[in-house]
Amino acid sequence: MVNVQSFEEDKIQLISIHLLDVENDSYMNLFWALEDAIQEINSNVSSAVVLVDLSDVILKPKSLGVGYEFYFISDLISGIKFPTIGIVDSEAHLALLELFLCFDIRITNRKSRFSMSHILEGFTPTDGGTQRLPRIVGVGRAMDLLLTGRCFSAEEAMEMGVVQYLFPKDVVGEAIALGSQIAAHGPIAAQYLKEAIMNGADMTLSQGLSLETDLNVILQSTFDRAEGIQSFLNKKSPKFLGR
């Protein structure tokens, strides 16, 4: 149900989720297994970036029963302190698209299709669809997608900012390559960048700038910052340790 693979000395963590049975018990078992996996990854000092493959996931909120709304997988994903990359190599509709939107970077197959067609079944998004989607694509486009429930292509998703990368094949392999690029940089700096962007988005510009300054000051005291400076002066590649 939840499989974790590590690459490049644990810097890249790949979580593959398998949920094709949408009954409530299966969902809850997945939730607890994923929670354990994420806690372990967050406590691993070697971790730098987390990839999550959602290609074998089906989520239909109406079939999950009472209690689903209190156990959102998206809350677990949002609690990952490292940069996250969401992977969909098929299609993402309804709650699966809502979950997909909570990742920092999203990649998909060129043939993928998406929709938030909750309204066609007489209900509304329950996992952030009405909040994350307009923040990503804008209010007007979100209104269109949510009120019509229409399907849209991977190309349109790319144009709107729903996804950042399209690949014709081997989407997981391409995601690992992207993760490798991110993991090669300072892991603490990457965490602080994520914190500044995600938290700053809900602040005024002045508050966001103050947060950016505070995180920069904290970063100055780390080993990785000193390593970066010394490597630049000595014209060699830095060896970041995440401390």
Regions found by a protein language model. Give the residues of each.
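A structural preference for short, pocket-lining loop segments at secondary-structure junctions
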Residues: 10-65, 78-86, 105, 109-113
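Terminal peptide-recognition signature
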Residues: 15, 34, 52, 100, ...
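Well-ordered beta-strand positions
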Residues: 99, 104-105, 144, 148-150, ...
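Glycine-rich beta-to-alpha active-site loop
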Residues: 71-125
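Hydrophobic, secondary-structure "cap" segments at the distal end of domains
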Residues: 130-140
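C-terminal long alpha-helix characteristic of the crotonase
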Residues: 107-112, 154, 163-210, 217, ...
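Terminal low-complexity tails and localization/encapsulation signals of metabolic enzymes
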Residues: 1-2, 230-243
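Alpha-helical segments flanking ligand/cofactor-binding loops in enzyme cores
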Residues: 75, 97-98, 131, 143, ...
